[in-house]
């Protein structure tokens, strides 16, 4: 019997008197086929260390520990730590860290792996309410994560992996795809969780690029330009740019010059621009003094 078997999950929760906290976005997976599929998608083997975020009662951790060299699982809910000690007692390659992943000193933590030189993959069932902050925190960190295989709300996975000229495409797509390739691996129905969430989930597979997708003069400015271009999705690029930078004659002249330099029409919307287009636009606007 697996931890994820519904009867085992229920017995563990009952034995420990555990009640779900909405503030932690807790939904425990009870489908062993999907758990195996996650491990297969992540291509976990004995030559890989895994960082897991939000192990819950250890359903996914069990599968990871059977395949990986070592698993370091970050759990913010201290009520789950003794439960994990119980459910994972047969594994000597699992470290449970009772800490918020956003506050963890990951540079120090990864040195605690028995073999810290192995490639590191992140595998997680992320709480819906904090998916984006966790992802961007990890992606922008200097930790050498090779790959992310992460379960999240389907809508967010679609936004991250979206292409230009689609409804889902936006600044989040650009922020992630600048650093990573991103592809939805498969959909996870809401019915396989306890308690069941209101929406379906998706497994998103992301691979870190050797170099960012494009080279830009100023990364912060590039991300700022991409964000402001989607503030009002139905407005033109020109309207979003002037709303942010201002509408004085001097500013408008600089914007016109920057758009001309980048060879981008002011009348299009942000969703029509590729990441490469945004790179050219940001560099051009920087060049004209914005």
UniProtKB/Swiss-Prot annotation:
Give the EC number(s) under which this enzyme is classified. Answer: 2.1.1.182
Keywords (alphabetical) are: Cytoplasm, Methyltransferase, RNA-binding, rRNA processing, S-adenosyl-L-methionine, Transferase
Q: Which InterPro entries match?
A: KsgA/Erm, rRNA_Ade_diMease-like_C, rRNA_Ade_Mease_Trfase_CS, rRNA_Ade_methylase_Trfase_N, rRNA_adenine_dimethylase, SAM-dependent_MTases_sf
Look up the coiled coil feature and give its residue ranges.
none
What SMART domains does this protein map onto?
rADc
Principal location: cytoplasm
Question: One GO molecular-function annotation for this sequence?
Answer: RNA binding
Compartments reported by the entry: Cytoplasm
Residues annotated as binding S-adenosyl-L-methionine are 27, 29, 54, 75, 100, 125
Q: What does this protein do?
A: Specifically dimethylates two adjacent adenosines (A1518 and A1519) in the loop of a conserved hairpin near the 3'-end of 16S rRNA in the 30S particle. May play a critical role in biogenesis of 30S subunits.
- HAMAP family, sorted: 16SrRNA_methyltr_A
Q: Could you identify this protein by its name?
A: Ribosomal RNA small subunit methyltransferase A
Species of origin: Streptococcus pyogenes serotype M3 (strain ATCC BAA-595 / MGAS315)
